[in-house]
Amino acid sequence: MVGIRYDWQELEIRAIYNTPLLELIYQAASVHRQYHDPTKIQVCKLISIKTGGCPEDCSYCAQSSRYKTEVKAEALLEKETVVNIAQKAKETGVSRICMGAAWREVRDNSQFEEVLEMVKDITAMGLEVCCTLGMLTANQARKLEEAGLYAYNHNLDTSQEYYSTIITTRTYSDRLNTIENVRQTNVTVCSGGILGLGETVDDRVGMLQTLANLHPHPESVPINILSQVPGTPLENQPDVPIWDIVRMIATARILMPASDVRLSAGRARLSQVEQAFCFMAGANSIFSSDDNKMLTVTTPCPDYDTDREMLNLLGLGMRPPSQRQEKVASPAVVG
């Protein structure tokens, strides 16, 4: 069985990424089968509980108040609304709810208290709950843990070297500090990046090296594909080739074998065949929706019926929620 390492070198990762494609997919699929059931995919639902009006300048984001996009600032959703959305998602087979707020950081106010209540209620439904709320202090992480939060998402986005080209209002160290604050609790870490920002292969390798040398690895590694939003600085970026996406997923799977690798934002433009290659390369999670949207109008997302049809075609089942004590995947060899 392939062991888990935390000392990956840049040259090693680049060599893996540049392996002939079919051989790379084979190697990644072999690793995947040692740690995960290759016949199961976790289906997740992302709820934008606070949309738009973010003060940060992330070049890709429609929710930044600095850019003229179709997204307008909205108030925090009512708890009952969020819980009802989660309940409907659960009825379709969704096992993980991710709640996102367009905040720079979490503030200790009534809105945070409301989020804590949302976490409690959705956790009580037997679902995994993930939050992505911006920067987080150690004390706030503990409060989320006490509310029953399963995971906290804080992406690195890209390599440390390329990062300042994409965002200037939050440092790379800020992101790593938030991850460390989450690590002080029993909440699992969700952290990945975005393809298509204008980064080089070296930047992709650098981001993966940072993630793969965190000890422990993030339990969840989302691989996002840029959706070019009109009005943002990256609106004219070219599409990422499918084989770049597959290479990134396969490399992440080999470097972090026990982690969930999530085929996240940008999946709507991929065909069923292209998504099948991503699953073969080690992706074992997707985001689905009942309204063709992931974050309001910012990122299109396939609907439940479309995804169910695809999973049935590929012979893949929906994975149930994990239990707290199982937050790090155990090795499981499936025939």
From Swiss-Prot:
Pathway: Cofactor biosynthesis; biotin biosynthesis; biotin from 7,8-diaminononanoate: step 2/2. Binds 1 [4Fe-4S] cluster. The cluster is coordinated with 3 cysteines and an exchangeable S-adenosyl-L-methionine. Keywords: 2Fe-2S, 4Fe-4S, Biotin biosynthesis, Iron, Iron-sulfur, Metal-binding, S-adenosyl-L-methionine, Transferase. Its EC number is 2.8.1.6. [2Fe-2S] cluster binds at residues 98, 130, 190, 262. Its cofactor is [4Fe-4S] cluster; [2Fe-2S] cluster. Residues 39-267 form the Radical SAM core domain. It catalyses: (4R,5S)-dethiobiotin + (sulfur carrier)-SH + 2 reduced [2Fe-2S]-[ferredoxin] + 2 S-adenosyl-L-methionine = (sulfur carrier)-H + biotin + 2 5'-deoxyadenosine + 2 L-methionine + 2 oxidized [2Fe-2S]-[ferredoxin]. Pfam families: BATS, Radical_SAM. [4Fe-4S] cluster binds at residues 54, 58, 61. One of its GO terms (biological process) is biotin biosynthetic process. One of its GO terms (molecular function) is iron ion binding. It comes from the Bacteria. InterPro entries: Aldolase_TIM (IPR013785), BATS_dom (IPR010722), Biotin_synth/BioAB (IPR002684), Biotin_synthase (IPR024177), Elp3/MiaA/NifB-like_rSAM (IPR006638), rSAM (IPR007197). Belongs to the radical SAM superfamily. Biotin synthase family. HAMAP family: BioB. Homodimer. Catalyzes the conversion of dethiobiotin (DTB) to biotin by the insertion of a sulfur atom into dethiobiotin via a radical-based mechanism. This is Biotin synthase. It comes from Nostoc punctiforme (strain ATCC 29133 / PCC 73102). The gene is bioB.
